[in-house]
Amino acid sequence: VEAVRCGRRPFVPLDLLNMENLEACLKGYGLMPSAVPSAELENLNLAWHRLKPWPDSVEGLFRLKERFIVAPLSDGNTRLLVDMAKHAGLPWDTILGADVSEAYKPMPQVYLRACELLGVEPDRAMLVAAHDYDLDAARRCGLKTAYVVRANAHDPSKAAVVKPRDGWE
């Protein structure tokens, strides 16, 4: 992703970047990707499409959807997000993957293009996220921000000690 952000590489979908990283990881462990059946390699790469939501996410999204437009703004490509929604029952109104703006967070065009497509001025939009860099970039583009505490995926017990770096809304 960083090579795209820095302009050293043109935009490519996250699924392709994930596959490249998977292949590099396999090589790092002395395994040649060509030794893995292509269907198995592809299935492993698409694991991102089958992520389980945080336990409070689906209910929270349904509650937000009653009054607001709910749309993920993600570095994932649109198909990845469609698959996640179908797999997890996520009630999104629309999906804004990185392929929509052909850019990755925290590039300003990601946030501004999303507002443009939704017909919303940045100061009337809010990014809800668990990453300070993402919230910081959104705020610099004029969006309101809300920090959601999410524990380390490997140790959910740390949720109580996770704190935002800045004073988000």
Name every feature range the model reports, one short phrase each.
Residues 1-42:
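A metal-dependent, Asp-based hydrolase signature
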Residues 67-68, 142:
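Glycine-centered short loops/turns at secondary-structure junctions
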Residues 21-24, 28, 63, 67, ...:
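Solvent-exposed, charged/polar functional surfaces in cytosolic regulatory/catalytic domains
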Residues 42-50:
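Surface-exposed cleft-lining segments at the edges of enzyme active sites
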